[in-house]
From Swiss-Prot:
Region Disordered, residue ranges: 594-617
GO biological process: DNA repair; pollen development
Subcellular location: Nucleus
Cofactor note as given: Binds 2 magnesium ions per subunit. They probably participate in the reaction catalyzed by the enzyme. May bind an additional third magnesium ion after substrate binding.
Protein name: Flap endonuclease GEN-like 1
Gene3D superfamilies linked to this entry: 5' to 3' exonuclease, C-terminal subdomain (1.10.150.20), 5'-nuclease (3.40.50.1010)
Keyword flag Ligase: no
Enzyme class, UniProt record, top EC level: hydrolase
Tissue specificity annotation: Highly expressed in anthers. Expressed in roots and leaves.
Chief location bin: nucleus
EC number: 3.1.-.-
Domain of life (superkingdom): Eukaryota
Keywords carried by this UniProt record: DNA damage, DNA repair, Endonuclease, Hydrolase, Magnesium, Metal-binding, Nuclease, Nucleus
Length: 629
């Protein structure tokens, strides 16, 4: 949730819509609890009996984020919850249990007293530890927070350890985040929303401490109620009256009953007059009821109006509907009216704030402004991404998810190929892919997946003798049941030559997060793999092969352009002999054009009659036949 009162809707106009390539090469901090709760709930809604959806979601999302999007994820685990968040936790428990929310503690003090020693849900904690174990086998860095996970994500982003945060909690900005990705869909053509603090500052004029002040007024996870009568718009208007450096100090003054604005003689809010008892603006000078300008109607009829005589020849022109006088007297009266209206509004909201006890809550302010959220006294460690431990990973997922080892190895191939290409780009290693079994062969073509271009890379197996030496699980890890696969140039589909009927997918849960299964080309001599790889990464890892492919593409485009130009020229020329069989004929050679027969004009400018007399009395079908005879 984060900040209450639809705070995301207030920020939505300043969101940037980025594509899948935005995260390539960037470090991103992922709020692990957000993935475990939100995506697991979505899978259970589709398949209530899904087996450990939190592990399945994390596995495929991590593979997609690392290999398809090219990001470097850093996962953050929640620590002990703050007692200030007890009301939100209780409300979630009540909603999940179907209980009446009216039984919730009415005050923050009651909720905090009951929640001081309450740990997190044991089942949820077990789920998180399973996810941490899986991430360690995948080689991903995992950091533990003292309290809220989004607080540590924001700290990593603010200190430059990561480039963005992936979380749905809007209070990440209050913890210091600079870039927040709210929702990330890997297999979707639609761009995702990315919020930059710089855009919010330029659009709304809000900085970190001003957002903290808004959370105190509107409410948040640490104070559900906030100040009565404050919504996002009212809170925004109020905090914009102060600078970031003194906005919290002004809230302290108002909480103590001191009016913070100048121009009012009463220093205490209780001594301020109510809006209804304040004096009205001074009456303006008399104006003509006919034209609306300064003066009166009698004098204008007799001597004329100085303003009307400038714009017209009449002495006094009747004022139009919605007329607004722009004389100095009226401008001053309007300004005074707006000033009094703003003063009345300021007094009203200040009285609402002063009526709250223990406002502002200093614990909430310190929680948001704290920059020490890592559960490690030595500070943020060096972030490294290691190679996955395949043997332990296969055993873990086989036990937890009941997956076949071949299925696991197939899904891991995009991640392994990405790691291999990164190593080749950085050090030009002489090793091969998949335990030195496959080497880079060629680039087949450019492939568009979800609006992003990729290289379709062909990997060749080094020796066929290695297949017989592999264990059964590794021997079939990529070949599967079908040996003959045809790669189509036009579509991103794999077609089995022996089986034409569509096969049913046995996986009952949502498949949108799964990466593409590698394609296998197997013949009597060689075995090949086809994978989708990032274009820039392949160019850096194998520059010679990439340059050769680009030259071939340019030659193909040049030949295609030359062939099309020849066809266009041949279509306008009159054939003098038999045409080649490969040249498409013009449709005008088969059907006579009526426009060509009647296009010439006589000397008198009249058009010649057509060779075929199309009588209006003939049926339409007969006239059509006569036209082409």
């Amino acid at each position: 949730m984060g900040v209450g009162g639809s705070f995301w809707d207030l920020l939505k106009p300043y969101a940037r819509h980025e594509g899948a390539g935005y995260l390539r090469g960037r470090r991103v901090a992922v709020d692990l609890s957000f993935w475990v709760v939100s995506h697991s709930a979505a899978i259970r809604a589709r398949s209530p009996h899904a087996r450990l959806p939190h592990l399945r979601t994390l596995f495929f999302r991590t593979l997609s984020l690392f290999s398809k999007m090219g990001a470097f994820p850093v996962f953050v685990v929640d620590g002990q919850p703050s007692p200030l968040k007890s009301q939100v936790r209780a409300a979630r428990f009540f909603r999940g249990s179907g209980m009446d929310l009216a039984a919730l503690p009415s005050t923050e003090a009651e909720a905090s007293a009951d929640a001081l020693v309450q740990p997190r849900n044991a089942k949820f904690t077990r789920y998180v530890e399973d996810c941490v174990e899986l991430l360690e086998y995948l080689g991903m860095p995992v950091l533990r927070a003292k309290g809220e996970g989004e607080a540590l994500c924001a700290q990593l982003n603010n200190q430059g350890h990561v480039d963005a945060c992936i979380t749905s909690d809007s209070d990440a900005f209050l913890f210091g985040a600079k870039t927040v990705i709210k929702v990330l869909r890997s297999n979707c053509k639609e761009p995702f929303e990315c919020y930059n603090m710089a855009d919010i500052e330029s659009g709304l004029g809000l900085k970190r401490k001003q957002m903290v002040a808004m959370a105190l007024l509107v409410g948040s996870d640490h104070d559900l109620h906030g100040v009565p009568g404050f919504g996002p718009e009212t809170a925004l208007r109020f905090v914009q009256l102060f600078d970031e450096d003194n906005v919290l100090a002004k809230l302290y003054e108002i909480g103590k009953g001191v009016y913070p604005f100048i121009g009012v003689s009463a220093p205490n809010i209780d001594d301020l007059p109510s809006p209804s008892t304040k004096s009205l603006p001074r009456a303006r000078s008399p104006h003509c009821s006919h034209c609306g300008h300064p003066g009166n109607k009698k004098n204008h009829i007799k001597d004329g109006c100085n303003f009307c005589l400038v714009d017209s020849l009449e002495n006094c022109v009747e004022k139009p509907a919605g007329f607004i006088c722009e004389c100095p007297s009226c401008d001053k009266a309007r300004d005074l009216k707006v000033q009094r209206r703003n003063e009345n509004w300021q007094i009203k909201v200040c009285k609402r704030i002063a009526a709250e006890t223990n406002f502002p809550n200093e614990e909430i302010i310190n929680l948001y402004l704290n920059d020490d959220n890592l559960d490690n006294e030595n500070g943020v460690p060096l972030l490294t991404w290691n190679k996955p431990d395949m043997e332990i990973l296969v055993d873990f997922l086989s036990f937890k998810q009941n997956w076949e080892p071949a299925y696991i190895r197939q899904r891991m191939l995009p991640m392994l190929s990405t790691i291999y290409l990164r190593e080749m780009a950085s050090s030009q290693s002489k090793s091969f892919l998949l335990y030195d079994q496959y080497k880079f062969h060629s680039i087949q073509r450019i492939k568009i997946r979800y609006g992003h271009p990729y290289y379709l890379v062909k990997w060749k197996r080094v020796t066929r003798s290695m297949i017989s030496n592999d264990p059964p699980s590794k021997q079939t890890e990529l070949e599967g049941k079908n040996d003959k696969v045809e790669v189509l140039d036009g579509d991103d589909e794999v077609v089995d030559e022996e089986e034409e009927e569509p096969t049913m997918i046995s996986e009952t849960t949502e498949l949108l997060d799964e990466p593409d299964v590698p394609q296998v080309l197997d013949d009597d001599k060689d075995c090949f793999l086809l994978t989708d790889e990032d274009i820039e990464l392949v160019n850096a890892a194998f520059p010679d092969e990439a340059q050769r492919f680009q030259e071939e593409q340019r030659l193909k485009e040049a030949k295609s352009i030359a062939r099309k130009s020849k066809l266009n020229v041949a279509g306008f020329e009159t054939p003098k002999g038999p045409r080649p069989s490969g040249v498409q004929l013009s449709i005008k050679e088969f059907y006579r054009s009526k426009k060509g027969l009647s296009g010439d004009s006589g000397k008198d400018g009249s058009r010649k009659s057509s060779d075929v007399d199309l009588s209006k009395n003939l049926p339409k079908s007969v006239r059509r036949r006569l036209l082409f005879d």
